């Protein structure tokens, strides 16, 4: 009987340390690129719940995301905000490393980021920023560096 309790507790501990793949996405009704980003996240193995709101400002501000980093959609996963067109590998890394942070952000809508692809394949350089609880940021990942 003791072994069964030990195994049950071990399984529970493993389940608690496994990062979630359940992403809640807040978006406005007119955002088309948001749907492309959601498809990118689903292809990477995330399940999504979509909430359509007239404004995302209260979602961001209530969780500590600075307005200066705002984009067209906001994700919430395991207590972290994912602001804008953040690539799935960056979210996976965030969940694995679990930094003391509000989340990650790709401010604006850089061409070539997930959901902002162009038919011509144009890609702008951009950074994924780690947003610290103080509101400060640091570069978390760099994408599409200039040739």
What are these regions (language model features)?
Residues 30, 37, 52-55, 87-91:
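Stable alpha-helical elements in mature extracytoplasmic
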Residues 35-78:
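N-terminal, post-signal-peptide region of Sec/Tat-exported proteins
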Residues 10, 27-30, 68:
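Secretory pathway export signals and precursors
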Residues 20-38:
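Local sequence-structure signature of Cys/Sec-based thiol-disulfide redox active-site neighborhoods
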Residues 26-28, 53-54, 85, 107-109:
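Active-site-proximal beta-strand/loop segments in catalytic clefts of secreted hydrolases
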Residues 62-147:
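Thiol/selenol-based redox catalytic cores and closely related redox-interacting motifs
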Residues 17-19, 76:
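Short glycine-enriched loop/turn motifs at secondary-structure junctions
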Residues 1-16:
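N-terminal export signals
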């Amino acid at each position: 009987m003791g072994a069964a309790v030990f195994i049950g507790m071990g399984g529970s501990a493993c389940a608690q340390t496994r990062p979630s793949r359940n992403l809640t996405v807040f978006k406005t009704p007119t955002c088309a690129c948001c749907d492309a980003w959601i498809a990118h996240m689903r292809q990477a193995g995330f399940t999504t719940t979509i909430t359509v709101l007239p404004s995302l400002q209260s979602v961001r501000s209530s969780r500590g995301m600075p307005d200066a980093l705002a984009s067209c959609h906001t994700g919430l996963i395991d207590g972290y905000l994912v602001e804008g067109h953040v690539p799935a590998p960056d979210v996976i890394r965030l969940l694995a490393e679990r930094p003391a942070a509000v989340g990650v952000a790709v401010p604006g809508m850089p061409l070539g980021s997930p959901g902002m692809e162009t038919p011509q394949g144009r890609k702008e350089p951009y950074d994924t920023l780690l947003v610290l609880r103080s509101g400060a940021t640091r570069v978390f990942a760099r994408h599409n560096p200039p040739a």
